[in-house]
Amino acid sequence: MNSLELYERRTYEVSVGQMPKVLELYSSQGWPALEAGGHSSFLVGYFVSDTGPLHQLIHIWRFTSDAERRDFWSNLFEDSAFMTFAAQLRPLLQRQEIQLMRSAPWGPRP
């Protein structure tokens, strides 16, 4: 495994009261679009905040390089099924935060 893996953490702050709608939208449209378009292989997982800041949907992606990451997002943003989903998701979000992280050269990796 490459010790220089790049992880991208995307945190979406969901409008209060809208999390059930966001989860349903991801389940019925977002995830199927990711799988059908062949985009799901980079996904480590989706998470919903339980303590600390609430109303957050967090997803983590793993890439071998920044070039691979940029190609992935470029391809995803050209996927019409995913973009139809994204257009419905955006009004339910308050803000988005993206953090890029490099894997440490020791310890377990997802």
Indicate residue ranges for each PLM-predicted region.
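Generic "edge-of-domain/loop-turn" microfeature
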Residues: 19, 68, 105-107
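Non-catalytic surface loops within mature trypsin-like serine protease
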Residues: 16, 63-65, 102-104
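Short amphipathic alpha-helical segments
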Residues: 18-43, 76-77
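Short, well-ordered beta-strand segments in beta-rich or mixed alpha/beta enzyme
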Residues: 6-13, 45-77
